[in-house]
């Protein structure tokens, strides 16, 4: 089992008069000998059905304090050192310069295109 970071809460409705809501204290007015009126003059407006309560923040979340911007921080820059761009190697095709004499002569003779002359005779009437 791990550490439970959440508060244990009972499954009891909030408006139960015997279990008070843990984050709020109800105002208590003690009048021992004074007469407490039973009927109050209520306004003609319907009261809200649900009392909105702010959610309590979990206690395990650490909220950092706000920092003041009074001090201006100037970063220290070293002006003596120069920044050189990185050298990027370029990929160039490598040409093999070793030439065999026999192979080059055969290549030259076989690579020359042959030109042939064809006579075209047209028979038009």
Swiss-Prot record:
Q: Where is this site: Cleavage?
A: 59-60
Q: What is its main location?
A: secreted
Q: In which tissues is it expressed?
A: Mammary gland specific. Secreted in milk.
Write out the GO cellular component annotations: extracellular space
Indicate which residues are glycosylated according to the record.
97, 104, 121
Keyword Phosphoprotein tagged: yes
Please list the residues that carry the modification Phosphoserine: 104, 122
**Keywords carried by this UniProt record:** Glycoprotein, Milk protein, Phosphoprotein, Secreted
Q: Which InterPro entries match?
A: Casein_kappa
| Domain of life of the native organism | Eukaryota
The biological processes this protein is annotated with in GO are:
lactation; protein stabilization
User: Where is the protein situated, by its record's location annotation?
Assistant: Secreted
One matching Pfam family is Casein_kappa
Region named Disordered: 42-63
The record's similarity note reads: Belongs to the kappa-casein family.
Q: Give the protein's biological function.
A: Kappa-casein stabilizes micelle formation, preventing casein precipitation in milk.
Protein name in the entry? Kappa-casein
Q: Which species is listed as the source? A: Lama guanicoe
Q: Which gene encodes it?
A: CSN3
